[in-house]
């Protein structure tokens, strides 16, 4: 039972250092393999309209990073796969579970994407299990990511249905208000939920939501994630698709959730909100900084590669990471 586990979130955990075995953090290898491909970082920008469009997806793929294209331009998905494959890049798309998506998946046989993410808010569902089975039947070589879920039972069921990876996180994101609207979710205990789910998993887990600092990437790996999906830290860049808005002479970019009225265009079943983020620099600068910070984390872990973070000790100190830092 869950109640036997300590409940904590990212800000409650500090990892404990080990003796460093590398001369420079630059020696630390941040690459990870998911399916048949290896990527520079165990990080993937959230498949949301204000985080990436086709151009950002292409930039990420060319740079050796994993990406998942969102599913909100349905008609553009097949041309997008062709655009990526024509350049020798991997194609990674999202699908929902509505009836017409079954025909869409069957149409992909001629030019199958390397990755498909089944992307719905409550992924522990018969509809998701049925879609996993359909994709695996039609496109046996495509790597299927299914989510989102928040329990070990869900992870096991989706894996048993054929999912190659599961995405864990129900509403912990900065622009997600599922926990407020419904009373359900992993907000406030996302890291403990990740740990709980990872203990049951036999295949990779993607932690999704609640990442606020680069140190949270290392913590996610410690508690069982193979890949970490990040929204707000990737929003608001020069390349980001969100609208740029000027307020009192300062530039902001809009960032909204995938079930918000801004994305749906209608105020129904809303579980997302819109916020404005101060406009940042280039996306590549953030990716480089994440890589350097993760290299430092690996060196503190006494390791040489990402997997070495899985073995460090940790301490639970409630809400401790901003202690002594009055600016927060």
UniProtKB/Swiss-Prot annotation:
Question: Do you know which InterPro entries this protein is assigned to?
Answer: Aldolase_TIM (IPR013785), GMP_reductase (IPR050139), GuaC_type_2 (IPR005994), IMP_DH/GMP_Rdtase_CS (IPR015875), IMP_DH_GMPRt (IPR001093)
* Pfam families named among the record's database cross-references: IMPDH
Q: Which GO terms describe its molecular function?
A: GMP reductase activity
The positions flagged as active site in the entry are 176 (thioimidate intermediate)
Known EC number: 1.7.1.7
Superkingdom of origin: Bacteria
Residue ranges that the Swiss-Prot or TrEMBL entry lists as coiled coil: none
GO biological process: one example: purine nucleotide metabolic process
Reaction(s) the record says it catalyses: IMP + NH4(+) + NADP(+) = GMP + NADPH + 2 H(+)
Family (UniProt):
Belongs to the IMPDH/GMPR family. GuaC type 2 subfamily.
The protein depicted here goes by the name GMP reductase
Species, as recorded: Streptococcus pneumoniae serotype 2 (strain D39 / NCTC 7466)
Gene label: guaC
